[in-house]
Amino acid sequence: MTDYSKTVNLLESPFPMRGNLAKREPAWLKSWYEQKRYQKLREIAKGRPKFILHDGPPYANGDIHIGHAVNKILKDIIIRSKTQAGFDAPYVPGWDCHGLPIEVMVEKLHGKDMPKARFRELCREYAAEQIARQKKDFIRLGVLGDWDHPYLTMDFKTEADTVRMLGEIYKSGYLYRGAKPVQFCLDCGSSLAEAEVEYKDKVSPAIDVAYPFKDTAALAAAFGLAGIEGKAFAVIWTTTPWTLPASQAVSVGADVVYQLIDTPKGKLVLAKDLAEDALKRYGFSDGIAILAETTGDKLENLHMNHPFLERDIPMLNGDHVTTDAGTGLVHTAPAHGLEDYAVCNKYGIELYNPVNAEGRYIGETPRVAGMRVWEANPVILQWLEETGNLLASSKIEHSYAHCWRHKTPLIYRATGQWFVGMDKAGADGKTLRDKAIKAVDDTEFFPSWGRARLEAMIEGRPDWVVSRQRYWGTPMTFFVHKETGELHPNSAELLEKVALKIEEKGIEAWFSLDKSELLSAEDCENYDKLSDTMDVWFDSGSTHYSVVKQREELEWPADLYLEGSDQHRGWFQSSMLTGCASSMGRAPYKQLLTHGFVVDGEGKKMSKSIGNVVAPQEVYNEFGADILRLWAASTDYSGELAISKEILKRVTESYRRIRNTLSFLFANLSDFNPIEDAVQQADMVEIDRYALVLARRLQERLAGDYYPRYAFHFAVKEMVSFCSEDLGAFYLDILKDRLYTTKADSRARRSAQTALYHITRSLVLLIAPILCFTGEEAWDIIGGGEEDSVLFHTWHEFPTINEKTEAELVKKWTAIREAREAVTAAIEPLRADKTVGSSLQAEAEITAPEEMAGYLNALGEELRFAMLVSKAEVKVGSELAVAAKASDGEKCERCWHYTRDVGAVAGYETVCKRCAENVGGEGETRHYA
């Protein structure tokens, strides 16, 4: 008896169904590094238009977390897709190396008692160790870049160019020195940038305090009264009693209506909208009378006594006064609040600051001298009670600024700092705020809501405090006059001389510099060397100048900055401000892309204490980096990205669908040589031409739309759908019969293989930016071998087809697919009751509208192959309907169709006439399916 299994074209796939990624990926990485893939790619891409994604530098401290992984994976997908789109897209990874967290770690490891030069040396060594650890993990994720030559903000050249950027801003006229209230961390002992502040709930005392009016006659006149008997008080409400020793004024709203109210305490001035609630707080229900009303502008320049100090307190009109809460009168301490500072500055009131850098009151402050501010609250409340000026006291929970490092409450404290002014006219007469808002208009945002967010932040932000009182940072390399505080008149030239020294020796060149090396003897007498360092956000915010503008392979401005949504306050903004404040005069990027934060499967923030942290190292060691990459790509990053073991298992199913499809495709291409065996499109079987159209349209959507607009979750969805629906459930299902049963070298089979070849090359190129390991594994088979890379090639070129022909083809096969789905549905009940097993055991009678019936009848004898049944007939009717039944034919041992001609050919007793022809004759021909 003949064994017909040897006559079918069942070939082994060179692409295994099991990826075994976690085990195999490291070996691929080693091979790519040895082949110098990144360097070869730079040579191949030379001369193409550039696409520059500038890397926002992660901080060089600790292991990478899942947020880092998402960020680097998204960047890598873009770099790879742009490369395959025909761009030269170099990627230079970077690290942020200066700043307090590294200082804290070095102090923990080595203590504080050492020369500052040695301390900075240890900081540099620590940062280098952290970078080496992080780099290893980033490479393991498959991120392609110039890892041998990353940029570090502690590189001597980068430090020097950061100093040059400071010089740019100085020359532009935006830099100034001032004593202004800034967010100050008592644990850091330093001012904080906006991006270093986070808000958490805090319980604070909420108190109502009476300020006695000095001149009740003037108060009466303001309310239109002839006179006032007894004492009168302005009542303020505050949640920061510790700021009262610095109180220098009381602010009222010019348009706010105020009432003069007679109470058991005396005459009180309160905002009309808040008076009722305030009086309840004071326990006043009887003996109350409203004497008069007036507006805040009439109260301007009245004077009061401080509630417990001997100090004159003027009443000012302030735009910041509201009637949302409190009393409508605001105690004003310019040393401890930006709005307070602004209103006092307008009235020419000189700032008084009783709190030092340790958060302690200076010696001249009665009762609280030497105390830390938080310790002073109960003392001040007691003091107010003694003077009779505490009307009410309670506790309130409210959102309050905290240090992002120490998680401790911040204070506003006036310090001598260096600022980049937002509303100061620069050398060109324009303010930095106006320039930055225009730059926002000129930037493209992904997602689009990022524009309004960044614009609102720039509109509302204070001047940028760029100085820090730390040791490990890029120095502010200025010489300051000892008496006037003015910068040296030759500061621009001196900055460049210092920058040249820093290029050679790093920042230590400044800290060890003797003034006499650069200044005359007279200047040495009159000028001090500034000891401040720069805000680390100035370091990273200047990398568009120190890196993008300096490195030969890059181009300024960058095409894209891509970071987490917190960077609207951080790197996006600091980069925008340095770009606009320098001679470049614009944003250093054309596009901004923002991704959300990673949360657990239930949408909760990840926390070590909760135990819901998913580490990227665990994921790639268990599942492989390609699964992590597919998860990142398949999640809509514009919101929060949820991850858990269950979610990763679902992602693995999608990966398996793609991989199994490729395994099938490669198996059926293993005896196909595209040069010798390919069939011209005009000679191809019709369904093969239709499949090519589907594949080309998929590529057009991904390469022409989803990849360019960074919509990777749509790209993944379409690829998985294409593999499962267009290929798995339709085309490949139909194709199996032709691939397996027709003659190996027949036009029918070679036509199918030609289509599969184009589909496979295109699909591998499309998955490669996301599944970089799997893409390269597949390209080793269909591309140019081990030394070749999918990245060395651009998107696949499909055979061209006439538009009209394509439209007709798609219309026809869309109708045929609809009929096929109806046939499948009609067979399901027969499968369920076990009347049939395979659909090939069934026959189908299809009733279809005239046009569809015409398409189906055009397939002739090949209709059964398209419908995946052993027999199919068509008749015209008003709507689509299918009657299915079990076939009464006999099963062919070779093709498994049920026909009435099994054994019809002598010598082929167990196979159908078609199979006998395919085995012993010239073989069948196919035109449609």
Curated annotation (Swiss-Prot):
Binding locations of Zn(2+): 892, 895, 912, 915
Chief location: cytoplasm
Enzyme Commission number, as recorded: 6.1.1.5
One Pfam match: tRNA-synt_1
GO cellular component: cytosol
GO molecular function: aminoacyl-tRNA deacylase activity; ATP binding; isoleucine-tRNA ligase activity; tRNA binding; zinc ion binding
Binding note for cofactor: Binds 1 zinc ion per subunit.
Residues the entry annotates as binding ATP: 608
Positions bound to L-isoleucyl-5'-AMP: 563
Gene3D superfamilies: 1.10.730.20, HUPs, Valyl/Leucyl/Isoleucyl-tRNA synthetase, editing domain
GO BP, sorted A to Z: isoleucyl-tRNA aminoacylation
Catalytic activity: tRNA(Ile) + L-isoleucine + ATP = L-isoleucyl-tRNA(Ile) + AMP + diphosphate
Motif mapping: 'HIGH' region: 58-68
Cofactor: Zn(2+)
Free-text comment about domains: IleRS has two distinct active sites: one for aminoacylation and one for editing. The misactivated valine is translocated from the active site to the editing site, which sterically excludes the correctly activated isoleucine. The single editing site contains two valyl binding pockets, one specific for each substrate (Val-AMP or Val-tRNA(Ile)).
HAMAP family: Ile_tRNA_synth_type1
Record-given protein name: Isoleucine--tRNA ligase
Originating species: Neisseria meningitidis serogroup C (strain 053442)
